């Protein structure tokens, strides 16, 4: 029994690793292609690719791991007593590693173009001029906004996302969606729509692993501490893409439980 459980958790962690990685590969790959080649994707196209990537990753991993693909989601399910506490840390580590390794894969696929761009534009990693390149991989809040404003936007965006996704997957009130496997497609559309509406105001992550994995990678490939701060003196901004989604996910989950699914 213990061997079976061990194999089962390994399989689930792999699906979280690979599913989160797929989201990163499609999304960051799109950003890299847009900034380093002549692809010139529009904001709409970039948002759609992120959304489709989320849908594909959910279809891939949901039957085995539940397709959390997001530490904020995992923490919410744990605090809601819907996830065994023994799975929390393995899931979060797997999601972050998936984000890290698939970002690294994308980084090395585009490495020659990245170096060429730096040489042609006299960009030195770890300087303010390198923020544009770093933003291919990482999420940096709009530093022209106040910390409180950016933090609230991140919390609101994630709360909205979780609230709607929970209702998509509510087998009691959305029996058709739940049983016809439409929810992953709608979840991808939701990611696309939130990005289109919110990103012009502030860059959002919705997912701590989406931000932390790439920043760890960049810190090891020449950007150093700049990868975390984005050159901003206010260190608090670093926590927005990590703590914002965690607080937002739990807020959205609480609203859904209290106002919608309280029967």
UniProtKB/Swiss-Prot annotation:
Residues 37-41, 111-145, 199-202, 221-236 are extracellular. The chain crosses the membrane at residues 8-36, 42-62, 87-110, 146-171, 182-198, 237-259. A motif (NPA 2) lies at residues 207-209. It is a multi-pass membrane protein. Keywords: Cell membrane, Membrane, Transmembrane, Transmembrane helix, Transport. The keyword Transmembrane helix applies. Mediates glycerol diffusion across the cytoplasmic membrane via a pore-type mechanism. This is Glycerol uptake facilitator protein. It comes from Buchnera aphidicola subsp. Acyrthosiphon pisum (strain APS). The lineage of its organism: Bacteria, Pseudomonadati, Pseudomonadota, Gammaproteobacteria, Enterobacterales.
């Amino acid at each position: 029994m213990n061997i079976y459980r061990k194999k089962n958790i390994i399989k689930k962690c792999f699906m979280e690793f690979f599913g989160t990685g797929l989201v990163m590969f499609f999304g960051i790959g799109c950003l890299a292609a847009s900034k380093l080649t002549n692809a010139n994707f529009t904001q709409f196209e970039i948002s759609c690719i992120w959304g489709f990537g989320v849908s594909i990753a959910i279809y891939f991993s949901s039957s085995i791991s539940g397709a959390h693909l997001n530490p904020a989601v995992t923490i919410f399910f744990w605090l809601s007593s819907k996830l065994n506490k023994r799975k929390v840390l393995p899931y979060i580590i797997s999601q972050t590693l998936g984000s890290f390794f698939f970002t690294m894969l994308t980084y090395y696929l585009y490495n020659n173009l990245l170096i060429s761009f730096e040489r042609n534009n006299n960009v030195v990693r770890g300087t303010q001029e390198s923020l544009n390149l770093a933003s291919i991989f990482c999420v940096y809040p709009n530093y022209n906004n106040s910390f409180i404003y950016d933090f609230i936007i991140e919390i609101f965006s994630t709360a909205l996302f979780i609230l709607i996704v929970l209702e998509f997957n509510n087998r009691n009130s959305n029996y058709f969606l739940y049983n016809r496997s439409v929810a992953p497609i709608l979840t991808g559309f939701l990611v696309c729509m939130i990005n289109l509406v919110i990103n012009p105001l502030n860059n959002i992550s919705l997912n701590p692993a989406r931000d932390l994995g790439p920043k760890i990678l960049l810190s090891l490939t020449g950007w150093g501490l700049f990868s975390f701060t984005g050159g901003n003196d206010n260190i608090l901004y670093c926590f927005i893409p990590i703590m914002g989604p965690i607080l937002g996910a739990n807020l959205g989950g609480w609203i859904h439980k209290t106002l919608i699914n309280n029967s």
